[in-house]
């Protein structure tokens, strides 16, 4: 029997590291009856933080999917990490969600990572509720955070509750819709609360904010607005309908507050998820694409009767085996079904289906459009692959992941672990598309690449803890790039005569800087038959293969354009291989003449510091060759945004803590590539040459 999809809510909880997402999820699970004893993050016992690395560090690394129920609605919750090195997890979960709860710290306000996550959610057009947490904290200020949401995120918070008391005196909230006060006792039991009349000293504020709430909400319905202007107050159901519409259309974001740790305020957030976040049928259907990645004009409609369309959005290995977390967009998926993976072109049989609750699971017979489930034991699937009905194949828009910016060499400490290391790394690549593994062709070293220092630290930790492989770790290496700055026309002739048939190929070509972001670009302007068309791909291949390695320090090249202008061939001695060799030699001949330059990755750095350390932090960023972009006051200090070369940011977290007595925070994400200053390029090139020499000995 088909489930009622209007009673589904697929949503994520996301925020800055330490804003209290995991604690909030724990409280939700307690209230919805999924767990009996609440696990505390600071004790390393939280239900959704189930990797050892997460429990030790107190940060959530993998998005754990959890299903629970509230007021006859099924909630599928994704708990996402807040640390910038794991932003990929946030992006990946937003891709498959219909709504979100953005958690902000009552004292920290809109912190760096909150901004990144908010931007991703805007890009994915995900409706959100705001929850200002930790109002029991010293320095907490609900109204200041609301103002920051407006100023920093350029978003419209719709205040739904007002706090009763603050810091140690925080006891509950006033629900503006009902004009009732929810007051919790200090027993630590979230169900021990009373609903009372509004405290006398708050009535004026309550009326003022309620009027603002009503006037903002009714703008969603002209008819209701007209009646209101004529003096008719909208009833509760009408108001909720208007708020739901505005939330769904991203016009505003219903804003709540509380203290998850003290078990105060979470029920109203759950009510808001049910009342205001969209169900799967209210979301724009996923477009289907062809093999070239172009939209076909068809859509995966949320309907259990339609052909199966599902997206694998996360692969995980746990103690039960390989899990493929899947969002079903249309159709129904049952045990025993055969599905087609459109990326590999292979079919697989579905052995077992499970509904996840953090790291425990419940076996189910089938799932349908709107569900988020895990498939056990799939072999050839990766994140972003589409699973569909083999009789009616279609591909959903895949996920796009950024290139890594940092790499380190790893080697097994003993020979017996070499094979184990290879198997472990291939599983880890399947699980995390922003993590890459390569083998250096010359040194045969295994190189792992990722999004930041912490990202790779955690991977090394996982190798040791989860797979039992001890590794030696090299020094972090920056992913430099090479390019040229000058346009050059040149010619090269490849001749080889050694008895029998020889080799001959002549090419006249132009090499020039390309537009930023174009990568490798090749075209032929040959007219007539001087270079027959059949040899053009060989010329392209020769240039493209060479392009993978620059001549300055051996780093990959970016943004270069190659044009085949003319040339000559011999009817007997010319071949595709001769033209490929000519192009490779031409590249080596011309690269150094075209004013090559080394490019370095520049990171967008966002630092929070208490005001009395601002001078030290700015001075330090300047010493790191940083360019300060802005400085603004935050809730409890200052926000400094800067562009800083990645090579200067190693170990920054330790230095920042020292400078700010442990109170500074920062986030960092890749921004762009920029030319290296000559003195820096000189050192990088020298070190690269020394490494090459050491490898060839």
Curated annotation (Swiss-Prot):
GO biological process per UniProt: ribosome disassembly
Any one Gene Ontology molecular-function term assigned to this protein's record: GTP binding
KW GTP-binding (keyword) present: yes
Entry keyword annotation includes Cytoplasm: yes
InterPro entries on file: EFG_II, EFG_III, EFG_III/V, EFG_IV, EFG_V, EFG_V-like, EFTu-like_2, G_TR_CS
TM stretches of this protein: none
Superkingdom as given in the UniProt entry: Bacteria
Coiled-coil residue spans: none
Record localization: Cytoplasm
Classification via Pfam families: EFG_C, EFG_III, EFG_IV, GTP_EFTU, GTP_EFTU_D2
Residues where GTP binds: 15-22, 79-83, 133-136
GO CC annotation terms, alphabetical: cytoplasm
SUPFAM superfamilies: EF-G C-terminal domain-like, P-loop containing nucleoside triphosphate hydrolases, Ribosomal protein S5 domain 2-like, Translation proteins
Ranges where the tr-type G domain occurs: 6-281
Keywords: Cytoplasm, Elongation factor, GTP-binding, Nucleotide-binding, Protein biosynthesis
Function of the protein: Catalyzes the GTP-dependent ribosomal translocation step during translation elongation. During this step, the ribosome changes from the pre-translocational (PRE) to the post-translocational (POST) state as the newly formed A-site-bound peptidyl-tRNA and P-site-bound deacylated tRNA move to the P and E sites, respectively. Catalyzes the coordinated movement of the two tRNA molecules, the mRNA and conformational changes in the ribosome.
Family indicated by similarity: Belongs to the TRAFAC class translation factor GTPase superfamily. Classic translation factor GTPase family. EF-G/EF-2 subfamily.
UniProt name for this protein: Elongation factor G 2
Species in which this protein is naturally found: Trichodesmium erythraeum (strain IMS101)
């Amino acid at each position: 029997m088909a489930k009622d999809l209007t009673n589904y809510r697929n949503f994520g909880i996301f925020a800055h590291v330490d804003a209290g997402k995991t604690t909030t999820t724990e409280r939700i699970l307690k209230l919805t009856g999924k767990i009996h004893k609440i696990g505390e993050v600071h004790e390393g016992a939280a239900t959704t933080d189930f990797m050892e690395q997460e429990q030790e560090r107190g940060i959530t690394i993998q998005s754990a999917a959890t299903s629970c129920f509230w007021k006859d609605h099924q909630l599928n919750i994704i708990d996402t990490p807040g640390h910038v090195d794991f932003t990929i997890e946030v992006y990946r979960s937003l891709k498959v969600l219909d709504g979100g709860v953005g958690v902000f710290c009552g004292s920290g306000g809109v912190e760096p990572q909150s901004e990144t996550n908010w931007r991703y959610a805007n890009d994915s057009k995900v409706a959100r509720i705001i929850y200002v947490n930790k109002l029991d904290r010293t320095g907490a200020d609900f109204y200041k955070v609301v103002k920051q949401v407006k100023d920093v995120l350029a978003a419209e918070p719709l205040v739904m509750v007002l706090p009763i008391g603050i810091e140690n005196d925080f006891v509950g909230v006033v629900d503006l819709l009902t004009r009732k006060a929810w007051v919790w006792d200090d027993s630590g039991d979230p169900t021990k609360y009373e609903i009372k009349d509004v405290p006398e000293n708050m009535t004026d504020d309550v009326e003022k904010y309620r009027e603002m709430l009503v006037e903002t909400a009714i703008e969603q319905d002209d008819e209701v607005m007209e009646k209101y202007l004529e003096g008719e107050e909208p009833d509760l159901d009408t108001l909720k309908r208007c708020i739901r519409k505005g939330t769904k259309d991203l016009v505003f974001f219903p804003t709540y507050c509380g203290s998850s740790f003290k078990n105060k305020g979470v029920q109203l957030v759950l009510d808001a998820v049910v009342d205001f976040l969209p169900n799967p049928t209210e979301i724009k259907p996923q477009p289907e694409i062809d093999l070239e990645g172009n939209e076909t004009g068809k859509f995966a409609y949320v309907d259990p009767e339609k052909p199966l369309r599902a997206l694998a959005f996360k692969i995980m290995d746990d103690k039960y085996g390989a899990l493929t977390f899947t969002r079903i967009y249309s159709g129904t998926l049952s045990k025993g079904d055969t599905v087609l993976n459109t990326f590999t072109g292979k079919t697989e049989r579905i052995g077992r289906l499970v509904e996840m609750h953090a790291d425990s699971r419940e076996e189910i017979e089938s799932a349908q459009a709107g569900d988020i489930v895990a498939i056990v034991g799939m072999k050839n699937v990766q994140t972003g692959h589409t699973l569909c009905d083999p009789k009616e194949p279609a591909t959903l828009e895949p996920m796009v992941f950024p290139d890594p910016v940092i790499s380190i060499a790893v080697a097994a400490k003993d020979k017996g672990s070499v094979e184990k290391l290879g198997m472990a790394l291939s599983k880890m690549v399947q699980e995390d598309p922003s993590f890459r593994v390569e083998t250096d062709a010359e040194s045969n070293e295994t190189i792992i690449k990722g999004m930041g220092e912490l990202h790779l630290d955690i991977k090394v930790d996982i190798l040791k803890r989860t797979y039992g492989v001890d590794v030696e770790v090299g020094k972090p290496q920056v992913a430099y790039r090479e390019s040229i700055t000058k346009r050059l026309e040149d010619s090269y002739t490849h001749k080889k005569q050694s008895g029998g048939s020889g080799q001959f190929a002549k090419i006249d070509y132009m090499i020039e800087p390309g537009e930023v972001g174009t990568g490798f670009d090749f075209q032929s302007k040959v007219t007539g038959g001087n270079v027959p068309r059949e040899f053009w791909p060989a010329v392209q291949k020769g240039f493209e293969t060479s392009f993978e390695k620059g001549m300055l320090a051996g780093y990959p090249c970016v943004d270069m354009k190659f044009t085949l202008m003319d040339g000559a061939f011999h009817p007997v001695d010319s071949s595709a291989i001769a033209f490929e060799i000519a192009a490779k030699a031409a590249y080596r001949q011309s690269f150094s003449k075209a004013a090559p330059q080394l490019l370095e990755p520049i990171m967008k750095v966002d630092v929070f510091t208490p005001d009395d350390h601002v001078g030290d932090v700015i001075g330090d960023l300047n010493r790191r060759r940083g360019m300060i972009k802005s400085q603004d006051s935050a809730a409890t200090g200052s926000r400094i945004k800067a562009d800083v070369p990645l090579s200067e940011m190693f170990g920054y977290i330790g230095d920042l803590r020292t400078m700010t007595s442990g109170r500074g925070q920062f986030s960092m994400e890749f921004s762009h590539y920029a030319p290296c200053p000559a003195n820096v390029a000189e050192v990088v090139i020298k070190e690269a040459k020394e490494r090459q020499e050491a490898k060839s000995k």
